[in-house]
């Protein structure tokens, strides 16, 4: 584990906990930090079904102001023709590799199950696993007539 990168992640998450609106931490770092503690994950993935560019810009502005890190937009696109995604690169003094932050439109959950850890909104472990299965299989979960979650696609 890169201790400087972890320190930067935790600083961004601390700032995020004070400013988060509709976005919540998801992905590998959410699993690693708050649930499994299984491996070091290097990026921060923030998901929201609302995906507001204004909110993203305010969060990034807050990250810059409070952390002092240089943050630049790397790319902005629609993944798979569905989910909007914005990738940012955070330059950390003394590190060769940057911290990567992405903001992703959640096209799987309209109302994700969000937990809070020290104020940080984090997707539930069930939601995280369904996202991983969806990403791996290329299918999407839907609820059938009697409330079971099934995959289609």
Where are these regions (language model features)?
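Compositionally biased terminal segments of proteins
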Residues: 1-26, 30-153
């Amino acid at each position: 584990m890169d201790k400087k990168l972890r320190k930067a992640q935790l600083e961004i998450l601390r700032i995020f906990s004070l400013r988060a609106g509709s976005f919540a931490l998801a992905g590998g770092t959410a699993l690693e930090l708050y649930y499994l503690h299984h491996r070091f994950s290097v990026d921060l993935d923030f998901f929201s079904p609302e995906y507001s560019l204004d909110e993203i810009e305010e969060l990034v502005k807050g990250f810059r102001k409070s952390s002092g890190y240089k943050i630049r937009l790397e790319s902005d696109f629609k993944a798979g023709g569905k989910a909007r995604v914005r990738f940012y690169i955070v330059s950390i003094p003394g590190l060769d590799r940057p911290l990567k932050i992405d903001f992703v439109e959640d096209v799987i959950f309209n109302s994700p199950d969000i937990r809070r850890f020290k104020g940080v909104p984090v997707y539930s472990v069930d939601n995280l696993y369904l996202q991983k299965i969806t990403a791996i299989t290329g299918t999407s979960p839907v609820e059938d007539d009697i409330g079971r979650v099934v995959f289609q696609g």
